[in-house]
Amino acid sequence: MSKRIAGPEIERLIQLLARVPGLGPRSARRAALHLIKKKEALLVPLGGAMQEAAEKVRICSCCGNVDTSDPCTICTDERRDPATLIVVEDVSDLWALERADTMNVRYHVLGGRLSPLDGIGPDDLNIKGLVERVASGAIKEVILAVNATVEGQTTAHYITDQLSNFDVRVTRLAHGVPVGGELDYLDEGTLAAALRARTTL
């Protein structure tokens, strides 16, 4: 049994921080110490912000995004193209695409990807909601922005099959050489995908 070096409140803070993705036990200890040292500037405001988020954050009933309103800010933005829908696995993917700031469209968050080995099937994802949105007739293109993994490919094929009876164009993100990437450092799968997705100049 390891020795306790701080009171239970600090230990609990460290344990909770260690559950945050990207923070292990050591990083959590460092973060906790930093927060405690900057109590008035960081710890107190962070605690307040977290409490407020816990009370106000909602899952958008339309697209699955997280926001403080339902429907979310993106779904209620009338400047966005209602005919184009980007399908993503998780909210983090939606936020990444928004940071790219290339398309002013709406989204649909699946809440994961199909993974039979992990027991995740179609009923565990928000695929039914996607089909219902497409069935409304307002959407003309569905862009599948799922990850280039085996599970992502499986999810994309399943969704394409589910939407095959609708008058909607289903596309997917091109995969290949990243901007600034050097060919020598890329794996064979990435190079093969880049060659298949080549474009005319």
Swiss-Prot record:
Coiled-coil regions listed in the entry: none
InterPro entries: DNA_Rcmb_RecR, Rcmb_RecR, Rcmb_RecR_Znf, TOPRIM_dom, TOPRIM_RecR
Domain of life the protein comes from: Bacteria
Family annotation (Pfam families): RecR_C, RecR_HhH, RecR_ZnF, Toprim_4
SUPFAM superfamilies the UniProt entry points to: Recombination protein RecR
GO MF annotation terms: DNA binding; zinc ion binding
Zinc finger (C4-type): 60-75
Key words, A-Z: DNA damage, DNA recombination, DNA repair, Metal-binding, Zinc, Zinc-finger
CDD domains in the record: TOPRIM_recR (cd01025)
Transmembrane intervals: none
GO biological process: DNA recombination; DNA repair
The UniProt record lists the keyword Cytoplasm: no
Domain Toprim, chain residue ranges per copy: 83-178
Main function: May play a role in DNA repair. It seems to be involved in an RecBC-independent recombinational process of DNA repair. It may act with RecF and RecO.
Family: Belongs to the RecR family.
Protein name as annotated: Recombination protein RecR
